[in-house]
């Protein structure tokens, strides 16, 4: 219920991932084909350190950040560990909003908003797109912080006060 939200903080995201309307049939086809493929067997890591090393390599993360993600994201399994997330989350979605639809939803955010984004930007959220989206908010402050998609974990001493100060203003 939007009327119950006093303030909104968006960290490294603002709105949905979008796709051009004219590519809807192609995206739908890809999603159906992916859903029809047999599921791969779970990858078993012999140790947490093996999973941490992979997360560091694939996502360009520091060891402490990768460790946090891995410790939260694996389950013990037979002689090792497996990712606890649903494999279907890695498959393409059949439908995405178009950019105009996403912008309309962003324009509907009525409360004061603080947007905290990483520099450099992620490939799926280029700088021009994210800056344009911020301009669609009714009341927004933008903060760019050196880091990656997990900047809140990489630099909590910077992100924490940015969030706390913004939320405390609502309480006063």
Residue ranges of model-derived segments:
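Flexible "cap/lid" loop of the alpha/beta hydrolase fold
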Residues: 6-47
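Alpha/beta-hydrolase
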Residues: 45-121
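Nucleotide-sugar-dependent glycosyltransferase donor-binding/catalytic pocket residues
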Residues: 16, 122-123, 152-153
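Conserved loop-alpha-helix segment in the C-terminal half of the alpha/beta-hydrolase fold
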Residues: 108-148
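Catalytic histidine-centered segment of alpha/beta-hydrolase-like enzymes
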Residues: 147-160
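Core-facing hydrophobic residues within beta-strands of well-ordered domains
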Residues: 4-6, 140
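Short aromatic-enriched loop/helix-cap "lid" or pocket-rim segments at secondary-structure transitions
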Residues: 19-24, 127-129, 155-156
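C-terminal alpha-helix
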Residues: 162-170
């Amino acid at each position: 219920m939007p009327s119950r939200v006093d303030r909104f903080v968006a960290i490294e995201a603002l709105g949905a991932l979008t796709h051009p309307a004219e590519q809807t049939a192609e995206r739908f086809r890809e999603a159906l084909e992916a859903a029809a493929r047999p599921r791969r067997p779970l990858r078993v890591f012999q140790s947490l350190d093996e999973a941490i090393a992979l997360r560091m390599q694939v996502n360009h993360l520091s060891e402490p950040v990768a460790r946090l993600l891995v410790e939260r994201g694996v389950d013990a399994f037979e002689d090792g560990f497996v990712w606890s997330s649903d494999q279907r989350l890695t498959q393409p979605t059949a439908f995405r909003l178009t950019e105009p639809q996403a912008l309309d939803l962003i324009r509907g955010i009525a409360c004061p908003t603080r947007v905290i984004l990483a520099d450099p930007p992620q490939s799926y959220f280029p700088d021009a797109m994210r800056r344009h989206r911020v301009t669609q908010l009714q009341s927004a402050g933008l903060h760019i912080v050196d880091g990656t998609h997990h900047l809140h974990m990489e630099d909590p001493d910077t992100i924490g006060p940015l969030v706390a100060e913004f939320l405390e203003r609502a309480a006063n």
